[in-house]
Amino acid sequence: MIIRIFLFSCITAVLLAKPYRGGELRTIESFQYGRFEVRMKSAPGSGVISSFFTFHDYWSEGHTSSVYWNEIDLEWLGRYDDKIHTNLIIHDQWDLPDISDITFNPNEDFHTYAFEWTSEYIAFFVDDQLIRWVDNFYIDSMYREQKIMMNIWQSTSVEWAGSFSTSTLPTYAYYDWVKYYLWVDGTGNAGTNNNFILLWEDNFDSWETNRWEKATHTWDGNNSDFIHDNVVFMSGYMILCLTTPSTTGYNGDPLSFNETGLPNTFQMHNAYPNPFNGEVVIPISLEQSQPLMLDIYNTYGEYIKTLKNGMTSAGKTRIKWNGLTNNGLNAPSGVYFARCTSIDQIITQKILLMK
């Protein structure tokens, strides 16, 4: 059992005493129930933890007793290249950890991870595939509002996280976006049994200070202090950094996540929200700068609108469609196809417009 005692108060720069520096980003608002989703690439390195989770910040309410504890965890242990750690923690620090096997290395590429939290169950997903379902008595005690959090830190638990070497540093976790869906119990359009509907998403194009705050704290078992400089917004990503005290911040190439930092081929990622009403975003990644055309067609193959036609820079771009035709008219509800053409490749994706 991994016991983590958070020390959220009385931590100042004067008291920084840990040998390493980590980072944490958290929402200002708290949430009760919903679907919590992230697209990210975790940090490699034995002894290194990167995360996406929710936590009831009882310290900020003036409580010190762990009887108020509620937490739902997705954690990546950098020692593994084929596993993900999930956990539930309720009052008095009762936890329910589990390690799940996955078919890829989460430290090498971006994938989508999510958990659904309702009054009836908590479920964890990797690339929309269910990996864990919990509907026992833990769910009855998981009712307190929680903040969305992401952090990177160095664990002192060798048994759990593995042995650590300073030569691992610096190491980084990359976050592409976060989405929050309301739980609407069968009346939504996303998640299990359409139980959820998208409320907001953040693409990390910048630091939305009305939504997120950077944390400065630590806890027993965490060998790093969280500092503002190790939460970096760059090139459409939020990057969490684990560093030495003398090399804080992000010192890598933001466009070289694999060595190149870019996908190995031209890619059109999943459009979101999909279905949509108002505006849909179509993420595109290119290995190198090249001409790109993105057109919308209906199910009869009729041309609707050109969204992009011209030279596109290497890296990641997001192309939006507001549901208007090339003539400025509102397209009717229905199925449409986004067709993206590059120098040597054509990719088509179905999108659904609902009004």
Model-derived segments and their meaning:
Residues 1-8:
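Sec-dependent signal peptide recognition
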Residues 8-17:
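Hydrophobic h-region of N-terminal signal peptides that target proteins for export
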Residues 12, 58, 184, 313, ...:
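Flexible, active-site-proximal loop/turn residues at the rims of small-molecule/cofactor binding pockets
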Residues 18-254:
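GH16 jelly-roll
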Residues 260-272, 276-355:
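C-terminal outer-membrane/trafficking sorting elements
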